[in-house]
């Protein structure tokens, strides 16, 4: 770690953001990412001959006693500090981020002895940031980097950092700043999201041991800043290894781990309201345009259906989005034009050595997937000057950029079908030749694939093309209707749409069933699962870049988060869907299915025999590696609930064990889970807080009553200048207007002091989230009283905000606020 006086590991999230703002760096992201970014900035300041910010210059002074405080102590101090309102808010947020003890258990399992105290706290805090952050869950980056650096930090057993002589703080050699930073070739500036190469655990440990030997042999010149003399080097190095331990890196967490974490959010969320119906648009079906049915859910198409872009908010910036035109052709000489109108900025991603903007344009069959160039009979020309088909790439033509126009030609009249391109009117030659026998008369459809870019099409609707085309070619819109082939159409009514929810433990065989069922019904279903999200992230070239920078784990972490938003979008589309997730808890089943009101809602339960399940999980672990901790599987077994037809399903199918046999097996699983796992922590209802002179939030009125805030015998009997009644008592502060509100009765139990009227109350008859705070206009609606202050921090707001799809911030990506109507998504 750095020798800077700012101990990054001891800072809270608010302090990390403050330090980053002072250095004009972004303060968005998870706690571990903020730590990494700040540490990199401090290292660069030292390497550049500029001392890190001193405490006297505005930096936080964490030396002395404050450096020795544990993370739990800091949280307690934060909860106790500030005024009374901030105290209650922090207590509420601690209750929200509890995660039923799951994050704590995961941290204890994955941490080493030296990091056992800090790991669970940080993972819980990171989960709280992700759910209740200021940016509504808009948090990008990888927290695994912060965990690894923390596990490798120079700490003793109590989390204290050894004091270092100021004179040695400027002597850290550049080669000791970390092999990861050298591999990225970075000499100055903040660390980017993808710029650090993560070494395997064995290599990391070997580097630490080799570094220890060099320090011991090389004396003070090459040693760690603040280290003892050369004679004590070996002793301290050995002691440091024992105290520090080896923390399990986050790369060991596979896809199942992040699915498990995301699934847990449903157990603490409120049931969402059904989404707003999609507007029925009357559109001329004979016009060639972008097809709103044959496109990705996150492919945002304009009202006129002639321009589009990929969604770039939150983790969607990692995804590629594609779409096809509504008509294809199989004869003649046909063309269309595509213009790159914008490379959409994605400032919430800190990227380097990664291409985050890309466009592929070309042709494909209607049976091909949306990832242009990744399958057979899918032909694309890339913005990078590369042609792609069936994942095979080859240099072609030249690169193109914003405001360039690409004309795509298809010649079906030659001996072989020829696909060629032109850039800004300049012919680039033939890119692909397809055998007519192999193509077998099947039509080719215009197809585009975008990655954080916006495009515009001319299928022939413009009076004048962007650039002149050869006389023998015709725009596809001008081809006679009988010579065009219409792409597949979706259901016309929502009652004709079908949603199938898979239910089963990880590795039970759900994806196998989905693959088989989709193959039996080609083109019918859109599969919503982590695998499909990963496919849209890991397009061949992008996957290689991510692998080179060691950030594939970032995609695994973001995929389940994107999937939740995909489900919300899907509920507004008239399509058929399969939800390929575990969905074992009744809460997850109910909250997802209530979004699809009006659909034919079906459940498919995959529950094999216990012996078969063990064999399948063992086989999966051998092939893919174990990606889910054992205790997480046990908890899912304990939460496994079979669906009921009367609740939210119209039809339930049991693939292997039938309902009676499956129910017996689940009872066995629940007993196994109960014996193996510790008792779950009860959710904080506020009743225990009363013994500590704390307010009973969400139980009684804020202005008084038995446990009211500031009421009799609360907060040490502090009556704050008034009679021994509640906070809104009669003669409080010299007959000033009463602050408390509520119904009838006395201000405090047993005291005959009248209360204030209901409507001017600061928090009326019920809790803080009820009715009003300072008058009838609501700060929080009447029913939003579950997690305090009326903000409804449940599933359908803030980080999981359903309403954000209907509000302005979703459409704040200029210039799309002028081109797209808000009701579309």
Curated annotation (Swiss-Prot):
The modification Citrulline is found at residue 255. Cleaved at Asp-100 by CASP3 during T-cell apoptosis, resulting in a loss of DNA- and chromatin-binding activities. Residues 8-42 form the SAP domain. Residues 41-281, 671-749, 769-799 are annotated as: Disordered. Gene3D superfamilies: 2.60.120.920, P-loop containing nucleotide triphosphate hydrolases, SAP domain. Widely expressed. Keywords: Acetylation, Activator, ADP-ribosylation, ATP-binding, Biological rhythms, Cell cycle, Cell division, Centromere, Chromatin regulator, Chromosome, Citrullination, Cytoplasm, Cytoskeleton, Developmental protein, Differentiation, Disease variant, DNA-binding, Epilepsy, Host-virus interaction, Isopeptide bond, Kinetochore, Methylation, Mitosis, mRNA processing, mRNA splicing, Nucleotide-binding, Nucleus, Phosphoprotein, Repressor, Ribonucleoprotein, RNA-binding, Spliceosome, Transcription, Transcription regulation, Ubl conjugation. The modification Phosphotyrosine is found at residue 266. The modification Dimethylated arginine is found at residue 739. This is Heterogeneous nuclear ribonucleoprotein U. It comes from Homo sapiens.
